Design a protein with these regions (language model features):
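Positively charged n-region of N-terminal signal peptides that target proteins for export
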Residues: 1-4
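Hydrophobic h-region of N-terminal signal peptides that target proteins for export
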Residues: 10-18
């Protein structure tokens, strides 16, 4: 069997025990060798909750969008955007004092960095005032090239967002944004031109085809189809670039992160199917185990399931390099570890 190297950003560095298989629907891999020291942070720099992870178009570096060593960046002097080489060495960082709660991260075909700020002001912390609910485009050197959304404004206009979760840039430069993260936020996909001009939007809150309950992540296959991780509805939805619904796949649990490689293989992370409340009962209706599912975009048939050994799941972002190594990020984490799956 092909060997996969799976890298996670997670909190506890306590056990290298093999995960138990909890979902026998698919081929499960549970024999892990764990490396807790793959990503090498600058001296004294902690890693925080991390939803965003992406890879450069040349496949030579990994970018991470963490929450400034904590659960958000409010009041922090740390840079949340970080670049690493494929040996795990940190190369650069930038973006301090710009974000409330870092969320989505995407590297476009020119190597520019796109990020979403998933929260904004509240009534309790004045340090949040005037920032949040935006999407930024950076050069690889950290220069701001474009800003979408109004700073600190949660709205539903054509140039406003409310908790944007994800961003994706097509080969022609058009920009797609998954706008919303549950609650009272939006539930839609926004499309803009390469210059930031609004083109169209689709979606509303609900569970029908074309509706969303947390459009958490976006990916595009070689045919140009848009894949949406509709986490709150326990499904992946597929659209054309005009927002026309094509199909939906429920076999990926609660999809938090999506990645499609050069071979049109789809990688989906499920971070919350087994989350449980104070009574011990599931917080959602998904019957699946948490982990990574790998499938072809042709038919969605899952060929490999990597069970999540972390007790509370929270695996969100995922990318794969050209050698087939898999890298992922967790929001319940403040440490690094690497899995070699045999």
């Amino acid at each position: 069997m092909k060997r996969y190297s799976l890298v996670f950003l997670i909190m506890a560095v306590t056990s290298a025990s093999v995960a138990q298989v909890r979902d026998n629907r698919f081929n499960s891999s549970s024999d892990f060798t764990i490396d807790y020291h793959f990503f090498k942070m600058q001296t004294g720099r902690p890693i925080g909750s991390t939803a965003g992870i992406s890879i450069s178009p040349d496949g030579e570096s990994i970018w991470i969008f963490d929450r400034c060593g904590a659960d958000d960046c409010v009041g922090s002097d740390l840079d949340p955007i970080m670049q690493f080489d494929l040996d795990g060495n940190q190369l650069k960082s930038f973006g301090s004092h710009m974000f409330v709660r870092p969320h989505g991260l995407h590297i476009d075909f020119e190597g520019n960095i796109w990020v979403t700020d998933g929260e904004g002001p509240d009534d309790e912390d004045p340090r949040r005032d005037g920032i949040g609910h935006q999407v930024f485009k950076f050069s690889p050197e950290g220069e701001v090239l474009m800003t979408l959304g109004k700073p600190g404004v949660a709205g539903d206009g054509n140039y406003e967002f409310n908790q944007p979760s994800s961003v994706l840039v097509a080969p022609d430069g058009n920009i797609f944004i998954g706008d919303g993260h549950g609650g009272a936020s939006n539930s839609r996909i926004m499309k803009y031109s390469a210059s930031g001009e609004f083109l169209l939007s689709w979606g509303s809150r609900g569970s029908e085809p074309g509706q969303f309950a947390v459009p958490h992540d976006l990916a595009m296959d070689s045919g140009g189809r848009i894949f949406v991780g509709d986490r709150g509805n326990n499904r992946v939805q597929i659209f054309d670039q005009q927002g026309n619904f094509i199909k939906e796949w429920p076999q990926f649990g609660r999809p938090s992160g999506l990645f499609i490689d050069d071979n049109d293989m789809l990688y989906v992370t499920d971070s919350s199917s087994e989350n449980r409340g104070p009574t011990g009962s599931p917080n959602n209706s998904s019957p699946y185990a948490e982990g990574v599912r790998i499938a072809s975009v042709k038919d969605g048939s899952v060929t490999l399931f990597l069970d999540d050994p972390h007790e509370n799941g929270s695996q969100e972002g995922i990318v794969v390099d050209k050698a087939g190594n898999i890298y992922g990020s967790l929001t319940a984490g403040k440490a690094l570890r690497k899995y070699l799956v045999r």
